[in-house]
Amino acid sequence: MSDMADAPASDERIKQTSALRKALIRPELGGICGTVIVFVLFAIFAGDSGMFNSQGILNWSIVSAQFMIIAVGACLLMIAGEFDLSVGSMIGFAGMMIAIFSITLGWPVWQAILVTFALCIAIGALNGIIVVRTGLPSFIVTLAFLFILRGFTIYLPQLIERKTIIGGIDKAAEGDWLAALFGGKILKGLFTWLGDAGIIAVFERGNRAGQPVVDGIPMLIVWALALVAFGHFVLTRTKFGNWIFASGGDAQAARYVGVPVNRVKILMFMFTAFCATVFATCQVMEFGSAGADRGLLKEFEAIIAVVIGGALLTGGYGSVIGAALGALIFGVVQQGLFFANVESSLFRVFLGVILLFAVVLNTYIRRMITGER
């Protein structure tokens, strides 16, 4: 007995994971490193160009928020093991529907927004139902909807208005309670005080002399932060979040333990459509118009942001915070190239390079996690 008690029990001990290894397998690692590198580079090459004053910060924050809104939906869907290539077309379609309902048909803007949300979420549900019922790859199904929605977005305004851009939404939205939730600003009083105190810049001449250059936080940014917080909470603090990981990691095993995989996937398609419609509504309220070309390539930008944030293309692994950091990188780089006087078309080159790098890094991380060689 004593010999057995004294025998080494190394085979019964739980293998400890080093702190370094834990850090390396965090999905946010790539996003964190990329964010630091991007900020350092632009601080060096564009630091004196106004990129980091109040107006410059607002500019790249708005662009980042746009990417962030659609990246949250794409992130949760990819973790669940699916893709949605119709996101960009959904943005254009949703914006056009708001314009047609409110301008052409004369509906109140709040009603046009609500009906558009219902319509787009229903289309997202249809995407999900087709995928789970037929077993077809979501890549193919949503690629089909990419063309269907874009086709309707071009055809309908031409049929009804004989043009592909419908304006006048800003005037129709004046005083509308729901439009203000997508196109207004918050904390205006705070920024007025900051301007009066000399903390932020104010206009020195013209009709706005004495007023702060930044007069509030756009609702676009508020929506982005709210969706990131919501997505992170659901993914990391709820049972449904565990279901999302399980559905993307091993759908068959998840079914065996009672996870409603099909329902999870359909709901994620619906949430992705919701995020795209939020983006479209904010965009329409900002510009006061809807255009048939809105949202082009946004589906790929959303996926790239998610991959930069550490999500695996195979599903079952990822982070909403990581996706948000990927979106932040996009916004900073897109605006930073302008401030650094670099040709803006190189932004597409950056997207391709960073996507390739992120996929290679994520593949290495997956092999570390699974022990593959």
Regions from the language model: what does each represent?
Residues 108, 112, 116, 122-127, ...:
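Helix-loop-helix "hairpin" substructures at the membrane interface of multi-pass membrane proteins
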